[in-house]
């Protein structure tokens, strides 16, 4: 269906994360039980919900899974890891130390000690998710990266753990896995931060443990938005929309263009390509969540995109680079038809863990900085302290904090 811009504007403006109180109540009970009972509760929930007790998978099993992979797939995993590493090594992460009046001001940058990575289970093994989360953490210098994935862990996930350089891997899933990582049990160490996507129970658990540990964000269904002009290929546009639509029925694929003829050709192409797509029914449901939008011009298309704040924004334009300055809100941007979002899912370089549900308005994609913390250091000389103490005391008294002011008065 082709929408007018005004038909979707209000919908785009209302976007945000929503949470099911029934799910949160269930998850809260799981978290409390694991926090209080440790491994006993962890195993109980794992048996009841996944059919297996929790176990740590030894590294020899990872190596064997890697060696059993098809040679071409091994090569693809290695290439993906190399590109992810290279991309994130470019990210600035150094602190500074500046001399000032006989003293110093400094900023220390330190990696987190221990990070938990959640890799969902299900019918499709998410090898790429493991690479896209573990590799940036290791580039940042995280000492120990612990992977959690539901039992039985797919051999492809084990192989990816070997390639990515993870440190430990537990066969555990769901809210109970998040609880174990957040609180620690006899077998599972407590981590400093939990990253990675999951179902609504995992997302609810991450939300509830935030504050006990850090989290990367709260992921909703995947979404893609393409802005296209008349130079774009309807065949490629339809394929790119379906690539995201097949993720799940709640995915949102959108195409924005001022060219009605292009939108009509894409609509016809979608019908044609759906005929032999294995996940056609899922994709059809997702296409109903998104749609094709006719805009007045490209300026209006970019205004709508910034309002929507998509996880993925593709610019299928004859000359996309000059339009990059118009992008304010997006998890990741893909320039031109030669840079499809599907490449970003696997091997382009940046992590595919990106903000959804409009949270790209205030949050970026997973990166090295998510595994670092900044510690400011103040070391002033007596002279500098004396010079600043009077003004500092004035500010303290303006806030009604006399104890602060007296502490500073003693330095004058």
From Swiss-Prot:
Keyword terms of this UniProt record: Amino-acid biosynthesis, Histidine biosynthesis, Metal-binding, NAD, Oxidoreductase, Zinc
Pathway: Amino-acid biosynthesis; L-histidine biosynthesis; L-histidine from 5-phospho-alpha-D-ribose 1-diphosphate: step 9/9
Catalytic activity: L-histidinol + 2 NAD(+) + H2O = L-histidine + 2 NADH + 3 H(+)
UniProt-listed InterPro entries: Ald_DH/histidinol_DH, Histidinol_DH_CS, Histidinol_DH_monofunct, Hstdl_DH
Biological role stated in the UniProt entry: Catalyzes the sequential NAD-dependent oxidations of L-histidinol to L-histidinaldehyde and then to L-histidine.
Residues at the catalytic site: 311-312
The encoding gene: hisD
Any GO BP: L-histidine biosynthetic process
GO cellular component terms given for this protein: cytosol
EC number(s) given by UniProt: 1.1.1.23
Name this polypeptide is given: Histidinol dehydrogenase
Enzyme class: oxidoreductase
Cofactor(s) needed by this chain: Zn(2+)
SUPFAM superfamilies noted in UniProt: ALDH-like
Domain of life: Bacteria
HAMAP family: HisD
